Amino acid sequence: MKLLLSCISTKHSMLKKHWTQTSQDISCPLTVLGSHQKPKEDLGGLLCLIEDMGSTQKTLELKMAAGMVTSDNGVFVTSFSGVHEVDTNLGIVRHNIVSSPLFNALHSISRTQRGYLVASTGLDLLLEFNRSGEILWSWWATDHGFELTPDGQPRVLDKLADHRSIQYGTRAQTTHINSAAELPDGRFLASLFHQGMVIAIDRETGEWQPVLEGLDHPHAVRVLDARHFTVADTVRGRALLVTINKLGAQVEADIDTGTNWLQDCRYDSDRNCWILVDGKNSRVVLRHGRSGNKKLAEFNFDPEWRLYETHVL
């Protein structure tokens, strides 16, 4: 198996210092509710290519590397305000292949039938775009019932401003929407960090309905097929395989990953294994089968790396 691992920061201790100074809980790699302001220092970031079951690793510095998806010429990688493209050997980097004034704190990215879908998390916004940067579809959480921050403050956004250099703290956001993926029927699934749920969004109307509730600050929604998706119940450390239909969703498999910050999870059906990103302990764990009851491998990394997600090459 050949994996790419993204690290949104390579200065984890600096982040913890920032959270301490702003009276935040540092028991997890991210604060449970987040902070009002982002640190002003350069937080670094990188990609790590993992081969030969972890025995071979290659790194490439890339600031605030986060979401990854297969592109026409390699892999698209999101950063704070742009989408870069790397080849699968990390030999070539094309910076800012796509950038938009509406890109702010980009998180996960996925393919759609028409292009790509990215979570512009800092703006509580989903954007679908093509390779030329044309915006094909957008969904603002603040226009669809999510007007208030966790502190009860109304959020008003200037949709015509250039947000690429503005820092919005997690608690200044109403949802901290951090991942989204398209279902074969055209609806979009999205994970809402603050609300603890996965929702399904109608492309035409923008109307949404809850699909899975009661999660603890979820991440990493991925669609497997017309009937299944996966999501990380982050603080509980649970990787969930979920069956979905028009009426709702039901958890089919629930894997306890032994962490209190599961940053990312994906089920690789071709290899019949889970790939789990433990942000608390800076490790990636492979587990066999849908039930994940057998550990196949564990890769440990520098504690200064704040791991984000993996991409299977």
Segments the model singles out, each with a brief description of its role:
Residues 51-53, 87-91, 130-134, 202-206, ...:
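Short loop/turn segments that connect beta-strands within beta-propeller blades
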Residues 66-68, 108, 179, 220, ...:
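Conserved beta-strand position repeated once per blade in WD40 beta-propeller domains
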Residues 55-110:
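Blade-loop segments of beta-propeller domains
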Residues 70-73, 111-114, 182-185, 224-226, ...:
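Residue-level detector of Asp-centered blade-edge/turn motifs that repeat once per structural unit
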Residues 43, 64, 105, 122, ...:
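Beta-rich catalytic cores
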Residues 216-286:
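Loop/turn-rich, solvent-exposed surfaces of beta-rich toroidal or solenoidal domains
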